[in-house]
Amino acid sequence: MKQALAGVRVLDLTHMLSGPYGSMILADLGAETIKVEPCHGEGTRKLLATDPKNSLEGMGAYFITLNRNKKSVAVDLKTVEGLALFKDLVEIAKNLAYV
């Protein structure tokens, strides 16, 4: 069965709760969702990361849950190369989620 948002590409610049939750729903509905993070990773990666019952591979359950079904790329927007990559991502995505 084809998903409702199959063929839609979203560039996800969100962090914390409401933004990642919204883009999680888009990804769950079939949108190709590309999360853009700083080179050191988005801050919520570490929430619960030290709890073995609530973490996997250094990422907490909070981050894993809200970012399921998404692709991820780390970009340093302070460099010329990083900014060029970001502009390329914006061009191919056509849809942007940010909070």
List each model region and its residues.
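N-terminal helix-loop segment corresponding to the beta1-alpha1 unit
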Residues: M1-V99
